Each structure stands twice: as structure tokens, then as C-alpha cells.
Amino acid sequence: MHTPKHAIQRISKEEMEFFEGRCERMGEADETMWGTKWCGSGNEATDISELGYWSNLDSCCRTHDHCDNIPSGQTKYGLTNEGKYTMMNCKCETAFEQCLRNVTGGMEGPAAGFVRKTYFDLYGNGCYNVQCPSQRRLARSEECPDGVATYTGEAGYGAWAINKLNG
């Protein structure tokens, strides 16, 4: 593909730094999806009970954000997350997908569909399953003190590409 000469403009180093800074700030500002406090790479909530305009969708994201996970670079259940993104327990991923499918009505339903497609089909970081060898679980909890995790592998092209390029 050839770019026409009239579409190319030389700019100064200062102008380039201005535009680079602007792009970086845009990325920081867009960490959560409009209408939500929890859907995205961060959260904007001041406390656990705060939800955005699309409260049903936001509730799904909030629950998912507080689910069992292994942050990038950390080890849990004998499994080290060497990827760029947080790795989630497969039970959490299943519950998150079902929650998003249950969000219907108005514009909130299509927004939940967008989150679901983006998260699972594009991002698709994969997840882990925990086996509890002793079959002994802590009282009133699903935690397994001697659990061992196995990774399912990336499910979406985006996560696969990012993890390969950064690894």
C-alpha cells in the first residue's frame, strides 16, 4: 500500500513528544469501559459496593475482578504466570461468561456481548484448573491448601500474540 505524499507531514521532535504523551494519557484514561466502574484493566470504584450506570454488566466484572487468580509474574498452586496478563481460575471464567450472557435489555445487553466477545475471543488468556490432591478443603471455603494448578493455554489470538512477543 502506498501513502500519497500530500498525506505525509514532517513534524518536530517536540510535536512528536506531545502526540506520544497524548496517546499514553488516552490509554490511562480508557482503562474501564464507559458506563462501568469495573469492566476493563482497572477499576474506578471508590468501594466494593459502587457500580456504574450499567450495573448488571458492572456486577459481572466486579465479581470476576475479585475471583481467584494468579497475577502476571507470580506463582500460586505451583503454577507460575509467565504471561503479561492476570491468569484466572477456570471456574471464574465460566461464571463470568454466564453472567455476561445473562445481562439483557436496552444497550446493556449488547455492551455485555461486546465485553464477552472481546474478553474471551480476542483477549482469551486461558485459565487454570486446581486439583486438590488431599480432597481436603478448608471449612466454609472452596480453598484447597495443597492444590495444584494446570494451565489450559491461551484461547484468544490477542493473548497468544502478546505473550509470544513479550516472552
Swiss-Prot record:
Localization of this protein: Secreted
Known tissue expression: Expressed by the venom gland.
Gene Ontology biological process terms, A to Z: arachidonate secretion; lipid catabolic process; phospholipid metabolic process
Coiled-coil region list: none
EC number: 3.1.1.4
Listed GO CC annotations: extracellular region
Chain positions recorded as Ca(2+) binding sites: 38, 40, 42, 65
Alphabetized InterPro entries for the sequence: PLipase_A2_dom (IPR016090), PLipase_A2_dom_sf (IPR036444), PLipase_A2_His_AS (IPR033113)
Protein name, UniProt field: Phospholipase A2 imperatoxin-1
Organism per entry: Pandinus imperator (Emperor scorpion)
Lineage: Eukaryota, Metazoa, Ecdysozoa, Arthropoda, Chelicerata
